[in-house]
Each structure stands twice: as structure tokens, then as C-alpha cells.
């Protein structure tokens, strides 16, 4: 990207796309890091792969990431706006998971370690959703020149 900036002298739109891409790379890298953290917890054996509590949250988060990348590829600000709105759904899933796990721990103290692992996974999914929102916000910036704070 730096070579492109120096050699091609991009105009405003090109410069916005380059700077937005650089910002998105950071968010995509963090998504990968958090996916790795989720995998480590699952591999540790404390969590069943098909844990019902997290299935819908995971699906919503994966959808957000996919749509944010699609919005970038297609320069689709409407899809980016949709991703931003979907963050409330993932935040709602996190709250439900958290409250369910608190109830589990109070009724069955032996569930403590497993519940903490599930809560960590839920928090990682919630953060992945936040990074998908960041990508969507940078899509809007790259197309319109306006940076939408979420």
C-alpha cells in the first residue's frame, strides 16, 4: 500500500480506499486472533462443539463478518449499514448467554469452569461482531468519505 501511495499519487477516492483497507486489515487480523482463541478453548475439551447456547450467536457473528467483507468487495454501503445494525443482535445474544451461564453456575457450582469457558467464547464472538462493524464502517468511509461511528 505504501508503494502504491508513493508511486501512483492516488486521488481522494483511491486514498480513502487504501486507508480504509489498511484499517480493515487490523480488524480482520483481530477477528482471526479471536477465532484462534475460541478454537483453543474448544480443543481444551471443556466445551462441546455443538453447544446449543452459542450456536445462534456464532451464526449471527459469522454472517456479520461475511457480509462486512462482501460489502467491501462490492462497495455496498447498504450492506455495510445492515452489518452495523446486526451488532445489536449479537450483543443481545451475549447478554442472554451471560445470564444463562450465571443461572447455571448458581444452580450447579460444578459447572463453574465450563461456564467461564463458554462465557469467554461468547465474549470473543461479541468482539468479532464489533470488528465486523468496524470493517463495515470503513466500507462506508471508502465509498462516501464519511466515517460512521457505531
What residue ranges belong to the model's regions?
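Cytosolic, long alpha-helical scaffolding segments
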Residues: 1-150
Amino acid at each position: 500500500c505504501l508503494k502504491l501511495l508513493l508511486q501512483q499519487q492516488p486521488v481522494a477516492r483511491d486514498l480513502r480506499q487504501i486507508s480504509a483497507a489498511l484499517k480493515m486489515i487490523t480488524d480482520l487480523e483481530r477477528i482471526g486472533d479471536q477465532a484462534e482463541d475460541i478454537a483453543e478453548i474448544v480443543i481444551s475439551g471443556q466445551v462441546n462443539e455443538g453447544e446449543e447456547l452459542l450456536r445462534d450467536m456464532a451464526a449471527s457473528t459469522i454472517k456479520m463478518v461475511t457480509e462486512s467483507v462482501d460489502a467491501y468487495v462490492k462497495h455496498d454501503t447498504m450492506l455495510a449499514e445492515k452489518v452495523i445494525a446486526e451488532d445489536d443482535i449479537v450483543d443481545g445474544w451475549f447478554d442472554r448467554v451471560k445470564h444463562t451461564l450465571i443461572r447455571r453456575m448458581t444452580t450447579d457450582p460444578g459447572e463453574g469452569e465450563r461456564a467461564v469457558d463458554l462465557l469467554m467464547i461468547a465474549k470473543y464472538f461479541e468482539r468479532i461482531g464489533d470488528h465486523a462493524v468496524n470493517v463495515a464502517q470503513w466500507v462506508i468511509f471508502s465509498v462516501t468519505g464519511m466515517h460512521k461511528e457505531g
